[in-house]
Design a protein with these regions (language model features):
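Conserved residues at the C-terminal ends of beta-strands
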Residues: 86
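Conserved beta-strand-loop surface patch within small alpha/beta domains used
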Residues: 1-80, 89-91
Length: 91
């Protein structure tokens, strides 16, 4: 992930994702959750996985399918760094 938005490479910053998912969570009135991933042995966040939100409530989120179900090519290359979730302001 880059530190700033890069429209030419479709890279999104962690901060940009966080702003988006917090605003989205507030808009739909549901907690959202998922994981940040790093390359194995690394510390920089390279991938973000977000749950679908289908069965989420204002105070509970489900991380959804693991990143390897949607990106099998990452298996053995990345590891979970942090579990994250939002708190909607209207909760």
């Amino acid at each position: 992930m880059n530190d700033s938005q890069s429209w030419s490479t479709d890279d999104v910053s962690v901060e940009g994702f966080e702003r988006f998912i917090i605003e989205y969570s507030d808009m739909v009135g549901r907690e959202m959750g998922g994981y940040y991933y790093t390359e194995i042995g690394g510390t920089d966040i390279k991938y973000i996985n977000s749950g679908m939100g289908k069965n989420n409530t204002r105070t509970m989120s489900y991380p959804g399918p693991g990143i390897f179900r949607v990106r099998a090519d990452l298996y053995g290359r990345v590891a979970p760094h942090t579990n994250w979730h939002t708190h909607p302001t209207n909760a």
